[in-house]
Amino acid sequence: MKNTSGHREPRTRPRERDPDRRPHPDRDHHVERSRDRGGDRHRERNGDVRGNGDRRAGREQRTDRDQRQDRHRDAGHRASEQRALEKSRQSRARPEPWGPSWDAAPTPGPAPWGPRELSQKHGLGRRGLESERASERYVPTYSVPALQEEEYYQSEAEGLLDCHKCRYLCTGRACWQMLKALLNLLILACSSVSYNSTGGYTGITSLGGIYYYQYGGAYSGFDGADGERAQQLDVQFYQLKLPTVTAAMAYSGALMTFSCLTLLAGALRVPWHCPLWLVIEGLMDALIAGAYVPGLYFFFQHLSAAYSSDVCKERETLYQSKGYSGFNCGVHGGDIGAGVFAAMAIGVFAVGAVLAFRGYRKVKKLKEKPTEMLEF
C-alpha cells in the first residue's frame, strides 16, 4: 500500500563492512557500473548507491577502496624491486660447477591479498642475500690441501680399517710393503738355521738331557778318536758356511727394516708431504730387486764351494761309516727355502718400485689440480 501523506519513510541503513574480513581477489577488478558512478545526483537522492543514498557512507567506501589499492600498489613495487635485485645478483655471481645454488629459483612475488608481514620477510631475504654475497659459499684456500689429501687416501683406502692413521694399511703399496717385510723375515729365519748349530751329533747333543743319550755320545758310536775327529770336522764345516750365512742374515734383516720404515712413513703421510720420498723409495726398490740376482748367485756359489770342500767330503764319509745318511754334501732345506723366498722377493720389490712411481705421479697430479675442481 502506498503512503498517501506524501512523506517518504527512510530505508534501513545497510550493515557496515567488517574491516578484518578478507576481500575477494576480484573485488576491485569489476568494471564500474553506471549506477555506481559519482555525480548521478538523481540516483543519490533516490538512495540507489549500494546503500541508502547517504553521501558519508559512499565516501567511506571509496576511502577504504583507495587504501586497499595503495596497499596492492606498494606490494607490487616491492616485488619488482626484489626481482630486479635477484637478476643483478645472479649476473654478478660466480658460476658454481657443482650443481645449482640455493637461489636458483626466483623468489615468488607477494600475493595481492597477502598480509603486512611480507615486508619483514623481504627484509630478511635481503640480509641473507648480503651474507651470501660476502662469503659466496667458496671453500677457503687453506682447506684445499686437506681435501686433496683426503681424496688421495680415500681413493685407495676404502676397506676394513676406518682409522685415519691406519687407513693406509689397506692400500696396494702398503700390502706390498708388508709382503716385502715378511719375505725378508723368512729369509732371515732360514739362514739362521745354519748359523745357530754346527751340525752333526755335536750340535744335537749340545742341547743336553735326553738328546745326548738318544743321539749323542752315549749311543752315537763315536767314541775315542772318531768322536774327536767328527767334532773337529763339524766345527770346520760350520766355519766354511759362516760368512755366507752371516751375509744372508744381515742382508735380509736390513731389507726387512727398510720395508718396515717405508710402511711407517706411508702411515704417517710422509709421501704426501714430501713426494720426493716416493721417488727415493721407487729407486731403492728397483735397486734391491736388481741386487737380489747377484746376491742369490754369490749365496749359492759360496755354499757350493763349502759343500764341495775336502772337509765336507771327509765328514760325510765319517758319518756314513757309523750308519748316518743325513750328512751328505749338498744344500739342505734351509738353504733352499732362503733361495726360494729371495726369488719371490725380486718380483715383489719390482712391483713395489712401479707402485711407488705411480704414487708419485698421483700425488703430483693432485697437488697441481686447480682449486675450482674441489669447490662445492
Curated annotation (Swiss-Prot):
Residues 1-95 have a biased composition (Basic and acidic residues). It is found in: Membrane; Cell junction, Tight junction. It holds the Pfam family MARVEL. Residues 168-361 form the MARVEL domain. One of its GO terms (biological process) is response to osmotic stress. GO terms for cellular component: bicellular tight junction; membrane. Keywords: Cell junction, Membrane, Tight junction, Transmembrane, Transmembrane helix. It is a multi-pass membrane protein. PANTHER family: GEO08273P1-RELATED (PTHR34609:SF17). As a component of tight junctions, plays a role in paracellular ion conductivity. This is MARVEL domain-containing protein 3. It comes from Mus musculus (Mouse).
